[in-house]
C-alpha cells in the first residue's frame, strides 16, 4: 500500500452532535438541584456554561449585558473601530454600576429647558445640581413639567441627602426607600460630588440574582481581537474587558501564535484563543487560559466545503479536551449547536462551556437587522467569513486582510436570516433547562460530574430519525424545538 492510500487507512472517524446520544444512568439527581456554573478561565466563573459568539449579528453591548445578567458571557465582536469596541465594553461595565462615576450634572443658573435637553440626550430622569463642586440640589423630569423658561434653582429639590463613597448596597437601598427618593449623590470628605446611586440600578442588581460580576460589582464582559491587533487588545484591557478572546479562523497559524504570545504579555485580562480542532494545536497554545474549539461547524460557515478542512465537532472537542487537560487549559466548544441537548453532549465530550451564534442571533438583544418575511419576523444572521462581514472588516479573521486592494475575497461563510426567538432570557431559560434535564438523566450534580459520567452511544441515521418527533403533524410548536430552523 502506498503512502497516499495509507492516509486513508489511518484516518480517524469523526462524530458530531447528531451522531451520538448520552446513555441514561442510575441517578438520585433532580434537574432542579444541579449546579450549572463553570470555570472558563482562572479568574472567570460563569453561572451558566454559555458564551455568545463574537459575531457582528450576535454580540454587541446589549447582548453582552443580557448574557452577563443571566450568568453567561458576551464576547463583543471586533468588526468595528477600536474606539467603538472600547465604548461597547464601557457600556457593559456601566450597565449596573453600583455607584455611577461619570455623573451628568447641571448648574443652578441653567434653565430647565437645558436640564430637560440633558436628560433626554443621556436617557436619564434626573440631574444633581452642582455649584463649586458641591451638591446644592436635585432636579427631575417631574419637577420640570410645564415649567419652561424657569431656572433650575427655582424648581430643584434643595434638601439633598448625600452619602459617603464607602456606603454598602443594602444601606443605600434602605435610605432611598425610607426617604422615597430615586437618586443618592455620593460625596467625598469635603462634600464634593464623586458619584451617584440610582434606584433603577439597585433594582436591576436585585432582579438579576444569577448575574456574573467582577470584584467591583460590574458585569463581566469579553471582547474579541485579531491576533495581530495588539493595540486593540491593550485598549480593551484598559477599558475593563475581563477576557480578551483572540478571534481567528485558524489559531494554529505560527505567525499568529508568535503575535499572540507578544499580546499575552501586554494585557492583564484573561486570555482565550481560538479556533482550533487539532489537539496538536494545544501544545503551541499553552500560554492561553482557554482554547476555543470549532473549525467549520457553524450553521453559517462554509469552511469545510470551501477549504475542505475541519473535524466533526464532538470528535474535535474530545481530542482537544484530552490534550488541554494535560496543561490545565479550559475548553470552549464553538459552533454547531442546534438544540439544548447538544450543549449536554458538548460538555460530556470535554467542554467547559459552549459558544452560541445561531441560537442567539434571533433574539431581541442581537444587533442583526429585523426583517418580515411572509408575515413572520426574522433577524439577519451572517458568518464572519461571509462576503458582507469580510467587506466590513472581518477578512483578517480568515487571513485575507490584504486581499481587498488586489483581488476579490474568497468567502468562508454565508448571510441569511433566522426566526425571531424573543429575549435572550427566554432563550437561555430553555437551553439551561434542557442542560439540567440532561444532567439529571446522566446523574451529574455539576459540570465536572457531567464530563466524568457522560457515556456516549453512536447512533445510525435511523437512530437520529427516531430521536426526533415522527409519525405526527405537529400543531403546536414547542419553545425548545422550533419547526423552522
Curated annotation (Swiss-Prot):
Q: Which organism is it from?
A: Pyrococcus abyssi (strain GE5 / Orsay)
Query: What sequence ranges are listed for the domain CBS?
Result: 99-154, 156-215
Q: Cite the binding residues for IMP.
A: 299, 334-336, 357-358, 381-385, 412
Q: Does the keyword Oxidoreductase apply?
A: yes
Q: Does the keyword ATP-binding apply?
A: no
Q: What is this protein called?
A: Inosine-5'-monophosphate dehydrogenase
Amino acids binding NAD(+): 247, 294-296
Q: Which GO terms describe its molecular function?
A: IMP dehydrogenase activity; metal ion binding; nucleotide binding
So where's the catalytic machinery, residue-wise? 301 (thioimidate intermediate), 397 (proton acceptor)
| Catalytic activity entry | IMP + NAD(+) + H2O = XMP + NADH + H(+)
Amino acid at each position: 500500500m502506498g503512502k497516499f492510500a495509507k492516509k486513508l487507512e489511518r484516518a480517524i472517524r469523526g462524530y458530531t452532535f447528531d451522531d451520538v446520544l448520552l446513555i441514561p444512568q442510575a441517578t438520585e439527581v433532580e434537574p432542579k438541584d444541579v449546579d450549572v456554573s463553570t470555570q472558563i478561565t482562572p479568574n472567570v466563573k460563569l453561572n451558566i456554561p454559555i458564551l455568545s459568539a463574537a459575531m457582528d449579528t450576535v454580540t454587541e453591548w446589549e447582548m453582552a449585558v443580557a448574557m452577563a445578567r443571566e450568568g453567561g458571557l458576551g464576547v463583543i465582536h471586533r468588526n468595528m473601530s477600536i474606539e467603538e469596541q472600547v465604548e461597547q465594553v464601557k457600556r457593559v461595565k456601566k450597565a449596573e454600576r453600583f455607584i455611577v462615576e461619570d455623573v451628568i450634572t447641571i448648574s443652578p443658573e441653567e434653565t430647565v429647558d437645558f436640564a430637560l435637553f440633558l436628560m433626554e440626550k443621556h436617557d436619564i430622569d434626573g440631574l444633581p445640581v452642582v455649584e463649586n463642586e458641591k451638591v446644592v440640589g436635585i432636579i427631575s423630569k417631574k419637577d420640570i413639567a410645564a415649567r419652561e423658561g424657569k431656572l433650575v434653582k427655582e424648581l430643584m429639590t434643595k434638601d439633598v441627602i448625600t452619602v459617603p463613597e464607602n456606603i454598602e448596597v443594602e444601606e443605600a437601598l434602605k435610605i432611598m426607600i425610607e426617604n422615597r427618593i430615586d437618586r443618592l449623590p455620593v460625596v467625598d470628605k469635603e462634600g464634593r460630588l464623586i458619584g451617584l446611586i440610582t434606584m433603577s440600578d439597585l433594582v436591576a442588581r436585585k432582579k438579576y440574582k444569577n448575574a456574573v460580576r467582577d470584584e467591583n460589582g460590574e458585569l463581566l464582559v469579553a471582547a474579541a481581537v485579531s491576533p495581530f491587533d495588539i493595540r486593540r487588545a491593550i485598549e480593551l484591557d484598559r477599558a475593563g474587558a475581563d477576557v480578551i478572546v483572540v478571534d481567528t479562523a485558524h489559531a494554529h497559524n505560527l505567525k499568529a501564535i508568535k503575535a499572540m504570545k507578544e499580546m499575552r504579555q501586554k494585557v492583564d485580562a484573561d486570555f482565550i484563543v481560538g479556533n482550533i480542532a487539532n489537539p496538536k494545536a494545544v501544545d503551541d497554545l499553552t500560554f492561553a487560559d482557554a482554547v476555543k474549539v470549532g473549525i467549520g461547524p457553524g450553521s453559517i460557515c462554509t469552511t469545510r466545503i470551501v477549504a475542505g478542512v475541519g473535524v466533526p465537532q464532538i470528535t474535535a472537542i474530545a481530542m482537544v479536551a484530552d490534550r488541554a487537560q494535560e496543561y490545565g487549559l479550559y475548553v470552549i466548544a464553538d459552533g454547531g449547536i442546534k438544540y439544548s441537548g447538544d450543549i449536554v453532549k458538548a460538555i460530556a465530550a470535554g467542554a467547559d462551556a459552549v459558544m452560541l451564534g445561531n441560537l442567539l442571533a434571533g433574539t431581541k438583544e442581537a444587533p442583526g437587522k429585523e426583517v418580515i418575511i411572509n408575515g413572520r419576523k426574522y433577524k439577519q444572521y451572517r458568518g464572519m467569513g461571509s462576503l458582507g462581514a469580510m467587506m466590513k472588516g472581518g477578512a483578517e479573521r480568515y487571513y485575507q486582510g490584504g486581499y481587498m486592494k488586489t483581488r476579490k475575497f474568497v468567502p468562508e461563510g454565508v448571510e441569511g436570516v433566522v426566526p425571531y426567538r424573543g429575549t435572550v432570557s427566554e432563550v437561555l431559560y430553555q437551553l439551561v433547562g434542557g442542560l439540567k434535564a440532561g444532567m439529571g438523566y446522566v446523574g451529574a450534580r455539576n459540570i465536572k460530574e457531567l464530563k466524568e459520567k457522560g457515556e456516549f452511544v453512536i447512533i445510525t441515521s435511523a437512530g437520529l430519525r427516531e430521536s426526533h418527533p415522527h409519525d405526527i403533524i405537529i400543531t403546536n410548536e414547542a419553545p425548545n424545538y422550533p419547526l423552522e430552523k
